[in-house]
Amino acid sequence: MCIRDRNYSVREHGNRIGFWRILDLLDKYNIKPTVPVNAMLAERYPRMVQECIDRGWEIAGHGISATQMITSKSSEIEEKAIITRSLEILRERSGSEIKGWFGQDFSQSTRTLKLLSEFGIEYAADFPNDDTPYTTNYNGLICIPNQSEWDDTQLMAIRRLMPWRWRDVVIEAFDYLYNEAHPSGTVMTLSIHPWLLGQAHRIKYLDEALKKMTGYKDVWQTSAAEMATHYRNNM
């Protein structure tokens, strides 16, 4: 088996096995996440999308596939085509309006926010430059903080942290933000991927992190869309 085939197979494990393990954990802790879904996954794994819809989870735009990213080298025509196809497929498969956007691997061009606002997107979650939401100059589009510093791919796949250290990082970050939150509040988003944390040797560390975080009082666990709406109405 070549390296490319192996990489595809590892990620397919996330769709076949890891997703369902994480699904069970989120149900266990009554967590309703925002799920960024690319167009290719929505077409190839409709049952996964339906499971999210049935639970009332938010579906957000996430491009076409991991191999078709928006970058600074993308032309405006290419970028519009990616956004258009992504949103069309997700709206068709989910039966709901798509309000948010998570760029593939946090990627975008200098025009992405402007284009997203023109497509009716209300928030983007690609910038780790704050701990609270903030508005942009693009038709009121809101940026939801999304830290790469505790993203599972960034820490475990790229920086090679052990899963127990990832758990500790997440809990330490949550604890600090919780204590810093009063009175204005802070936001912590946690990006996870089924192909990575859904593995048998890692899933228990996600369980332990979620157990710890859901044990805190006065924490609002919500979707990115609800967070954006709340911020817009109260800023």
Per-region residue spans from a language model:
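Catalytic alpha-helical scaffold of carbohydrate-active enzymes acting on polysaccharides/glycoconjugates
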Residues: 4-143, 167-190, 196-235
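Positively charged, amphipathic and often flexible ligand-engagement surfaces
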Residues: 144-165
